[in-house]
A protein has these predicted regions:
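Glycine-rich nucleotide/cofactor/substrate-binding loop typically near the N-terminus or early
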Residues: 2-66, 155-165, 172
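Glycine-rich loops and low-complexity Gly/Arg-rich segments
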Residues: 2, 32-36, 80-82, 120-122, ...
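Short acidic, glycine/serine/threonine-rich loops at helix termini
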Residues: 20-21, 106-111, 115, 166-171
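Gly/Ser/Thr-rich loops at beta-strand to alpha-helix junctions
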Residues: 13-15, 98-106, 163
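A structural signal for small-residue-enriched, beta-sheet-centric alpha/beta enzyme cores
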Residues: 132-147, 158-180
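Glycine/threonine-rich beta-strand-loop-alpha-helix active-site module
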Residues: 74-84, 88-95, 102-154
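Hydrophobic alpha-helical hairpins/lids featuring a short glycine-rich hinge
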Residues: 43-97, 102
Length: 182
């Protein structure tokens, strides 16, 4: 302690582990727990951080990197389940913290949880797309009300990198190995 010195805290996060708690503390929000699945489809209670009309989903809490690393079997489906839960609860602004996730499916799993249907070249449905299914996806079908539903919503994605998804410096090439890609 030093006389005349004032200490102020400033919550900061890179969009990974702890992002939701950081934001909910700074915004004086609440934490709700919703039914979801982890990146391998196991049922979990995942935190949904909320304040005002905002719901924050922390991928590091829902689909976190795990000891078992199987990027081909990992999916963002649980993130989509949380989005659906938040939509059903009436939220319109969504912040998704992308850091610390264990999947690399381009969001296909999350879209499937929101009703987008994915099919392979034989017309066979791929109900819960994973990273390994991306090469099999030939066609997708977006529900007729999907575009109307998302028109009134605002999405913010929080991360500390600017990598595109594909290419030499893409997220798949750069971050895939930490998630189990070889």
């Amino acid at each position: 302690t030093h006389p005349g010195v004032t200490v102020a805290t400033l919550p900061l996060s890179d969009g990974g582990e702890g992002f939701g708690t950081c934001c909910v503390d700074a915004c004086k929000g609440d934490i709700l727990y919703t039914n979801a699945v982890d990146l391998y489809g196991n049922a979990i209670q995942a935190p949904l951080y909320t304040w005002g009309d905002t719901a924050l989903i922390e991928c590091a809490a829902t689909c976190a990197l795990q000891t078992k690393k199987d990027i081909m079997a990992a999916s963002s489906y649980g993130v989509g389940m949380q989005l659906k839960n938040a939509i059903d609860l009436g939220f319109h602004h969504f912040i998704i913290g992308l850091g610390g996730s264990g999947m690399c499916d381009g969001g296909a799993g999350a879209l499937a949880a929101l009703g987008v249907a994915f099919y392979d070249r034989n017309g066979t449905a791929i109900p819960h797309p994973t990273g390994g299914d991306l090469q099999r996806i030939e066609r997708l079908q977006i529900p007729s009300d999907f575009q109307h539903c998302v028109k009134c919503m605002h999405f913010t994605y929080a991360c500390d990198v600017t990598n595109p998804y594909t290419g030499e410096n893409g997220a798949a090439a750069v971050f895939g190995p930490q998630k189990g890609a070889t």
